[in-house]
Amino acid sequence: MKETIDFLIDTIEARQVLDSRGNPTVEAEVFLECGAIGRAIVPSGASTGAHEAHELRDGGTKYMGKGVLDAVNKIHETISPALCGLSALDQTIIDKLMIEIDGTPNKSNLGANSILAVSLANARAASKALDMPLYRYLGDPLSNLLPVPLMNVINGGAHAPNGLDCQEFMLVPHGVKTFSEALRMGTEIFHSLKSLLDKKGLSTAVGDEGGFAPELSSCEAAGDLLLEAIQKAGFIPGKQVSLALDVASTEFYRDGFYKYEGTNLTSSQMISYLSNLVSNYPIVSIEDGLGEDDWEGWAALNKEIGHKVQLVGDDLFVTNTERLRKGILEKSANSILIKVNQIGTLTETLEAMDLAKSAGFTSVISHRSGETEDTTIADLSVATRAGQIKTGSLSRSERIAKYNRLLRIEEELGNQARFAGDLGLGPKNI
């Protein structure tokens, strides 16, 4: 039996490492008195919302200004001295103390990247000290639900240098009984899609998240390709495998218009366009269908199609409880995307998920386009019984690492493991 002193933080180390785009990011290690060590690496986004917590970068010439040595120094010089001697089991106290020391609304003093690295590393250290898997430590004995994967197999927008304005076209394999079956289904469709692209003379180069980045002219062209790939792989669109979109509308919202596929659309016209897509394709989820501050448009979109599909706020909510409360009050959406680095601590992430659940919203755990080998979000999805996870395509090892972690968790849970399947999707199945 470990004594209380065994869980005390002895020291915290940090370093600059690289993410999947070759850009610097922060890695932190929390060392406990008992010898347990927790390590975490933070991700970084390409299409970042204006309301996200602040990511500290060095500027200057090294790494084109994207170095994070300042953030590393903040951990060594400010965060570590403040946290040493505290119990790693007191996650909320640790996170709130870092927020207090930072003293800014968006963590621009210490940097969300430095704070989050320590927050996640601390949770890992605590779980190791207790000899528990992270999903069990963060969750409870009933944390046995494996999420439906939303697999980004065609990349566009800020994630790929092609002509697609829509950022992500995702496969949603839900009509099976296990996560491993869903992963197999998605993988077979991914390879089917590659074969189709080859035959059509289209590029099979991949984007930031491992999806293909062919030169396509429209969202509909991508949707048609996915339906063809699903059927070619031997599966039934809409029954076994559905589609999801991340429109990332903020990226092309300018001067009151959505500059989409060569035309200027009003909010009302964009809503009509999305409604038509839902009518013509087996789409179960649309993320960021409108811009991050188009609150009136979001409410209209939710009224129009929120009873049919999951409407996910990413840039709209940025994993922030204040913006989520506004969205709940105004009935702006029915789901929230959860990105730990948007808010900057594990505690605030869990608070956002609790608030979403209390309002009947679904939560989708998500990676970022600049990822690492860190697999925390896989454990988080099971710990919180989120029911859905976005962690990229079926290529690039920083994406596969999360899928492989979920396979191990499913195996570890044995006959207690459940797969979210159809029940993991919203809004009708909330």
Swiss-Prot record:
Broad enzyme group: lyase
Record lineage: Bacteria, Bacillati, Cyanobacteriota, Cyanophyceae, Synechococcales
Free-text comment on the cofactor: Binds a second Mg(2+) ion via substrate during catalysis.
InterPro entries xrefs: Enolase, Enolase-like_C_sf, Enolase-like_N, Enolase_C, Enolase_CS, Enolase_N
GO cellular component, one term: cell surface
Family: Belongs to the enolase family.
Gene Ontology MF terms: magnesium ion binding; phosphopyruvate hydratase activity
Matches recorded under NCBIfam families: eno
Active site residues of this protein: E209, K339
Family annotation (HAMAP family): Enolase
Location in or out of the cell: Cytoplasm; Secreted; Cell surface
Protein name: Enolase
GO biological process: glycolytic process
Pathway listed: Carbohydrate degradation; glycolysis; pyruvate from D-glyceraldehyde 3-phosphate: step 4/5
Binding site for Mg(2+): D246, E287, D314
Keyword Secreted on entry: yes
